[in-house]
Amino acid sequence: PSQRKDFDGLFEAMNGYPVIIRLIDPPLHEFMPDEEKLLEEVVTMRVKGETEGLKAKEDLLVAIKGMHESNPMMGLRGVRLSIVMPEIVEMQVRAIFEAAADCTLRGIVVKPEVMIPLTGTVKELDWIQPRLERIASAVMGEKKIKFEYKFGSMIEIPRAAITAADVARDAEFFSFGTNDLTQMTYGYSRDDAARNFLITYQEQGILLKTP
């Protein structure tokens, strides 16, 4: 409901204009409580003998530990997360199209453009896009309304850029995610490179400017 309300506000504010909505991109652990803080709470509750709510916190802690990745940027996120846990993105797409349908019924012109992030191969779109399009059709059928919409892809992995002609068979539009694309092309970490070596590289003429 909260996401649907947010999308409703977006469509209303952008009446008549396309609204590009990127589906969930960050890894799941970014939406979870801080692991160290949660561990402190669990230990404190155990020491004090507090049992109410302890099991839930322990289960959450186990789940967070299970989501740990050595390199989250290149791990389970974007379209990969949508394929492994499709119920998350299906819920998000349903919220988008229910909000769009409700706005249409109120006379607002909506043009949702749903963007699938971190696509690396057209096979990923072949798997996820038909499922999302079925949700769009189902919502419009339930609401007895029709409106324009598109499904597109973010190009932020070098392989996606190289195989863009194949990706374009499914994607109705592209958006270039230049931050991730630059990091993966150069093999640089945006967070670390500037601090550790980019200044030296520019001083030594290896790079004329930061990528």
Model-derived features: where do they sit?
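Conserved alpha/beta-domain cores
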Residues: 1-211
